[in-house]
Amino acid sequence: MKKVMLATALFLGLTPAGANAADLGHQTLGSNDGWGAYSTGTTGGSKASSSNVYTVSNRNQLVSALGKETNTTPKIIYIKGTIDMNVDDNLKPLGLNDYKDPEYDLDKYLKAYDPSTWGKKEPSGTQEEARARSQKNQKARVMVDIPANTTIVGSGTNAKVVGGNFQIKSDNVIIRNIEFQDAYDYFPQWDPTDGSSGNWNSQYDNITINGGTHIWIDHCTFNDGSRPDSTSPKYYGRKYQHHDGQTDASNGANYITMSYNYYHDHDKSSIFGSSDSKTSDDGKLKITLHHNRYKNIVQRAPRVRFGQVHVYNNYYEGSTSSSSYPFSYAWGIGKSSKIYAQNNVIDVPGLSAAKTISVFSGGTALYDSGTLLNGTQINASAANGLSSSVGWTPSLHGSIDASANVKSNVINQAGAGKLN
């Protein structure tokens, strides 16, 4: 059987990885490195046999190496170079006109759902249905399910996934040393009920943890690539936003560590918990964020509902007056959230302590210790009149750096291309 699998892999262009790269692929999450280390820990595909270790350099090879979502065989996948997910089976680039349903027309869509005539109802009818079909066409190419017991790592210093959305519904997944760019939705949906003025919403995150457990995302970089939303037009007075989140978690996702990642030039970075009404998330969404860098991120770094989230030694930098990505807040205190924040650093000129966070309906508590704002120690919880009692104290973590050392440590170490 192993010989057959290896022969199949070679036929598809999947090559066994070299010894040097394999060192990274066989690494597992440390025994106390955040919530991802809880119970069984996160080992990914570290137990893969040699016939289930692949190097891939295009979408076809990646999809083949992953196999079906039910493929729980341990596997290690090394990404070499850039993988563009917006391609057909012949690796021909695909764009708006390739995915677009014949009935979909943006001008007709804008006319049909103009708030001055359509009002605050959710869009329905011919153009919304055509938009949804168009989006479904794109989804079939760019969204891939990551099965259980999988490690995906970048080979060398320049591994990239462009235009893709990795979705994790499974258990025991490791993703490291990859730059994720431009999870671009060609067909944003107008939602007149989102906020007081409505908003354009997109479908794809770089990584979506949809009920997945025991996940480690480490030393990755996330950005909008060559198509930042800052260059998009406005319709109905709102930005026509083509990107959603960078690393989102919902629907019972649990036991996750996100470490040494570099998030930059983006609006909504990470939301943990999709809805206030999803009370089944209470007791789940246990996530650790440490040594991550957030540069020119507007909001959600992270925004939390329900979860016990340990946020320590992260570095935030931005400007409230930026014309492209104006800083709004770092931590979103949502319904029944339980963020435990330690020794984080925020450099946003002119920002007040109260504005470092945003408090949403049902958010009542935040533990905050050691936060430096523009060089001065603050307490964001006290500045917003929140309780400091979140009902838990983290025990799964490594040494916590002094706040004075966070900026240099994170800048020097966070992001893809720094492990090799």
UniProtKB/Swiss-Prot annotation:
Residues 1-21 form the signal peptide. It is found in: Secreted. The keyword Magnesium does not apply. Binds 1 Ca(2+) ion per subunit. Ca(2+) binds at residues 205, 244, 248. The keyword Calcium applies. It is an enzyme of class 4 (lyase). GO terms for biological process: pectin catabolic process. GO terms for molecular function: metal ion binding; pectate lyase activity. GO terms for cellular component: extracellular region. Induction: Negatively regulated by TnrA under nitrogen-limited conditions. Optimum temperature is 42 degrees Celsius. Optimum pH is 8.4. Its cofactor is Ca(2+). Its main location: secreted. Its EC number is 4.2.2.2. Monomer. Belongs to the polysaccharide lyase 1 family. PANTHER family: PECTATE LYASE 18-RELATED (PTHR31683), PECTATE LYASE 21-RELATED (PTHR31683:SF18). Produces unsaturated products from polygalacturonate. This is Pectate lyase. It comes from Bacillus subtilis (strain 168).
